């Protein structure tokens, strides 16, 4: 007796069983789910996989997204705590990790995250040996280094979300002051994602007009318009949002989706992302910091050589030293 489906549908050819644009998100917390919904909203993948250790939360998030399938262009949404579900991913977004406890040192937090990553990263590489790993978990620059060491992947396929969000915040705040859209405000935040990031004031422009030429004191303490405050706001904005709502998730989710889009669509766009900077600007250790990088389907294709002023280079080097002082003491890498 033929089933309803057999009566309805006449097969013509076998469909493809291997996804062509699969993305995995590891960690279904606030950030992981913001990444997931932002990726789905852009219609970037034909399959989305979610992984976490919390099975009920994981299944609930998967079902909730599946119920929205009518409104999405992603044919398959799957989830499991078993990493086999991630097989054949083009991009794996890592948002998992432990949270910093009150009074906990950064080194201790990093070491606890290293212990988590020691389980996660080999599993990712086992099932998707050709993927690009995009690290989002904090402290992102150190954990990108950790991922690179644990994965054995070439450096162009291990990328940290880095200062892509800091740069977006910078351009938004600049745009607010000038009354124009952030896409028309050009400026870059480089270095460490966080407190010691570097604002490249010399390159800030609108329509090719250098703002520092119009206001030579821009970004310094002598500036009557106090543009330096904009960078200060960039650094403090995450703390402010966390103070108000307990965490940040939407902006980082949107930022990650943009990075995924650049890679999956092979767009060769330039983003401020965390990459191995050894050998640039006189940095001698294996540290990851954000520089303007060209991303494509093969990962991080090239780095733009920014003309930095001496004080900006000094800030970058200081960031590198800070990160290395923590990295050199990490165990089990």
From Swiss-Prot:
CDD domains: LDH_1 (cd05293). The keyword NAD applies. It is an enzyme of class 1 (oxidoreductase). Keywords: Cytoplasm, NAD, Oxidoreductase. Pathway: Fermentation; pyruvate fermentation to lactate; (S)-lactate from pyruvate: step 1/1. It comes from the Eukaryota. This is L-lactate dehydrogenase B chain.
